[in-house]
């Protein structure tokens, strides 16, 4: 019965089942599962990168944190910190496939420019759209540099490099 109602609901909207909704929900559930099961508490150096500006998690940050703090202790969840603390220590987000300046600014408020990486989402998005959007961003230049390169250098422990003249 559930399958039939699912088919009826999504039959004319099958394009929503993939990247726009289903992928984000699945990744969000896995990431939050890692948090609530104490994975980052047991492995504090573990770093996870979530694409698409955090797969909706930053937009539910207050609600998730509210439930973690008010409900987690009675449920006996393994996590020891708040969702915001895990984002500050273990979770990163990318701009991949999400070239919206207001959305980026919101994510900067929620997780901080120090935890965001510029990314494109190729082959689903093209370099031209991503780079045109990024080059035209009207945000603090220091934050733009962090998102564009400094955060990746830090996360991936990249050595110093020589800027090409091209």
Description of each model-found segment:
Residues 20-40:
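Specific transmembrane alpha-helix
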């Amino acid at each position: 019965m559930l399958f039939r109602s699912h088919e009826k609901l999504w039959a004319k909207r099958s394009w929503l089942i993939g990247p726009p909704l289903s992928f984000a929900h699945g990744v969000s559930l896995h990431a939050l599962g890692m948090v609530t099961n104490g994975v980052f508490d047991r492995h504090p150096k573990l770093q996870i990168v979530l694409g698409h500006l955090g797969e909706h998690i930053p937009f539910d940050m207050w609600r998730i944190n509210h439930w973690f703090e008010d409900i987690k202790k009675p449920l006996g969840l393994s996590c020891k910190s708040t969702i915001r603390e895990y984002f500050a220590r273990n979770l990163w987000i990318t701009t991949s496939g999400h070239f919206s300046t207001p959305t980026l600014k919101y994510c900067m408020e929620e997780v901080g420019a120090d935890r965001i990486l510029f990314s494109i989402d190729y082959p689903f998005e093209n370099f031209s759209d991503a780079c045109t959007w990024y080059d035209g961003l009207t945000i603090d230049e220091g934050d733009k540099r962090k998102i564009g390169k400094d955060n990746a250098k830090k996360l991936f422990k990249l050595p110093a490099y020589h800027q090409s003249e091209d």
